[in-house]
Amino acid sequence: MARVTVQDAVEKIGNRFDLVLVAARRARQIQTGGKDALVPEENDKYTVIALREIEEGLITSQILDVRDRQEQQEQEAAEIQAVTAIAEGRR
């Protein structure tokens, strides 16, 4: 199944090299970043799940970039809020 998925996923991304980068990034997110898979896991490895998500059009490089930016902004806002709370507590 993974071989067929790779061929279909290449068509969605454009070339094999970008596919490797996007799939690895997404697989890492699922494995270590606490991100939930967007397709049923079906006892597949993280890389296969990432390829299936790409094949179905659920994940692209642009989608990952937007999500990363949103998470970074949320993290920065939380840090600012925490620093503000600490500063107000010292007054």
From Swiss-Prot:
PANTHER family reported for this sequence: DNA-DIRECTED RNA POLYMERASE SUBUNIT OMEGA (PTHR34476:SF1)
HAMAP family (UniProt xref): RNApol_bact_RpoZ (MF_00366)
Protein's name in the database: DNA-directed RNA polymerase subunit omega
Keyword entries, A-Z: DNA-directed RNA polymerase, Nucleotidyltransferase, Transcription, Transferase
Biological processes per GO annotation: DNA-templated transcription
Protein function: Promotes RNA polymerase assembly. Latches the N- and C-terminal regions of the beta' subunit thereby facilitating its interaction with the beta and alpha subunits.
InterPro entries: DNA-dir_RNA_pol_omega, Pol_omega/Rpo6/RPB6, RPB6/omega-like_sf
EC numbers for this chain: 2.7.7.6
Family, similarity comment: Belongs to the RNA polymerase subunit omega family.
